[in-house]
Regions:
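C-terminal intrinsically disordered, low-complexity extensions immediately downstream
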Residues: 1-78
């Protein structure tokens, strides 16, 4: 799969992606653990959403335990 090619996302996952973007916009930070806590998701599901947001160019790559860099102005994107 090409680096910028996104895996197929279900309608349910897309709804979750939108909720995650809103949380990231409010918190001004992004991490798998933040999404797990705020949305009561398991690690695998939260990590998949973070991967989708990275593929879409919204979040930067992971750097260990540090929060992800937010690459777009989410306030302007609303």
């Amino acid at each position: 799969m090409a680096m910028h090619e996104e895996e197929e996302v279900t309608a349910e996952e897309e709804e979750l992606v939108e909720k995650c973007i809103e949380i990231i916009r409010q918190e001004k930070r992004a991490s798998t653990s933040l999404l797990q806590r705020r949305l009561r998701l398991g690690y695998t599901r939260a990590a998949r959403i973070v991967d989708i947001l990275e593929q879409r160019g919204i979040l930067g790559p992971g750097e260990g335990a540090k929060p992800r860099e937010i690459l777009v102005d989410l306030d302007a994107a609303v």
